[in-house]
Amino acid sequence: MTKTTMRAIFTPQALAAAVALGCCAQAHAVAFNIGEIEGTFDSSLSVGASWGMRDADKSLVGTVNGGTGQSSTGDDGRLNFKKGETFSKIFKGIHDLELKYGDTGVFVRGKYWYDFELKDEDREFKPISDKGRKEGAKSSGAQILDAFIYHNYNIADLPGTVRAGKQVVSWGESTFIGNSINSINPIDVSAFRRPGAEIKEGLIPVNMLFASQGLTDKLTVEGFYQLEWDQTVLDNCGTFFGVDVAADGCNNGYTVGSPAIAPLAPLAAAFGQPLQVTREGVVVPRGGDRDARDSGQWGTALRWLGDDTEYGLYFMNYHSRTPTVGTTTAGLSTLAALPGMVGIANGLAPGSGSGLAQSVMLGRGQYYLEYPEDIRLYGASFSTTLPTGTAWTGEVSYRPNAPVQVNTNDLTLALLNPIAGGAASPLTTSPGADNKGYRRKEVTQIQSTLTHFFDQVLGAERLTVVGEAAVVHVGGLEARSKLRYGRDSVYGQYGFGGDTDGFVTSTSWGYRARAILDYANVIGGINLKPNLSWSHDVSGYGPNGLFNEGAKAISVGVDADYRNTYTASLSYTDFFGGDYNTLEDRDFVALSFGVNF
């Protein structure tokens, strides 16, 4: 790898994440020459499997599917996999090619995968399909990741580099906690779920121009301009961690109301208001996704190296990589048809007209995913080493107009407002109008990370400990009785059963930690790395799922490698705690074997 490519991939944040994930040693690259062109080719192949370790929590399964949850929009994955069953059996590969001529080069990375469990096995509850899905969310596929050209140069003995093409740019000092300064590239969530996942598999490169130039021997300026917008890849519906309604192509999972209304569906169709009713209820159709535009995403950074500390200042204007959910109320033609069909329904089955009217308003409405544009981010960071040898980093980020998701139950109930006199939901609604799924708020986040190496601990050559804590403040939140943000729909609407908690709070915080022991040459040249990870959301509920009070997770594992070529990894992850934790029944074991060459 050249100096430029190392900058592109192993920035301080990526290095910290590599330590945090227990990244294995680098592969033995194949080096070659074509005349004066120097080339390297890296390859990694692996097989792996993951097993679910808990039965589905009935409180997280909708009532229509035999549970006690107030929504069925997130239970397909729970009902598709039983305790002890594999939810992934995968073969995958990733390859890096770099060609360099002097100070100029090309870097290309590609990956492919085939999940035998998801692709070839029958599912107990609902089939898993690749139709209409993003490539990264499919059960099998292949992708070109990075593909950029670069050039290194010097101006007055001050180094500079430029890159153009699909690439990853990492800023800030965050290691574990999201919503940080490091928000330039979207994430492939599906890739990170796969056993044996590497960091480079889950970061989505985007076409952009990037430049870095030294102004003095201590001051550097960087900047980027993205040539396209891309979105985060979400888990496919029906998979172990998937949500039924969010991924591309998952269009029929937003079900509400009662399936008992099905016999009256032909009556609605006769009045020109057809609706789809399944065993899970009335389907709210999915409207077209409202993707962000390609233009308008850029940022600049200044880095200053003091005697013992590096400081950074950042500004970005970017479009959201993760979607918000909104709804669109049925139009005037639907309202005009209601009196006639309600009268006939009551004649056929006294008292059924009200249920039919609600079902028609729900089934003739829509939901849509929207990616808000022009989010501004201001940030500052530092990185230093304490006298104890502990690496200490930190950052603060401020978004004056960050989108925060409105409670989705209120958005669904807003579809009923035209026939409920506005009493169904606090959202103001008119026929045919959008119920925007977010509001812009001031969001400030402060976080700090400590990393320390302890030599000769418990017989290991080294113990690495990384800890990170963050606090988030959301400004301008309305009174909860007027408008709510966040909380999964499975917990019901505001006030259901007297429950008014679990919504986004003005302040929230939590911390993450990871410890790794390094045992070299334990048996016949095999190196072992036992590791322990811990996550705790201490207080409050963060915007867009960032923190969830009381939620905890612990992961225990061991990584092994032989001659930096053959690898193995085994881990157990347990989710627990918190009154609104939808991961409580998603405990799993992951096992993988790999070879690097």
Residues covered by each model-derived region:
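Short loop/turn motifs that connect adjacent beta-strands in outer-membrane beta-barrel proteins
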Residues: 28-41, 54-56, 97-106, 150-163, ...
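Membrane-embedded beta-strand positions in outer-membrane beta-barrel channels/transporters
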Residues: 40, 92-96, 146-148, 208, ...
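Transmembrane beta-strands of outer-membrane beta-barrel pores
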Residues: 47-53, 103, 112-116, 166-170, ...
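Solvent-exposed loop segments that connect transmembrane elements
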Residues: 57-78, 119-135, 185-194, 237-286, ...
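Short sequence motifs at beta-strands and strand-loop junctions characteristic
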Residues: 85-89, 136-141, 198-203, 290-294, ...
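Detector for outer-membrane/organellar transmembrane beta-barrel domains
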Residues: 86-88, 316-318, 323, 393, ...
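Outer membrane beta-barrel
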Residues: 100-251, 510, 539, 547-552, ...
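Outer-membrane beta-barrel "beta-signal"
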Residues: 585-597
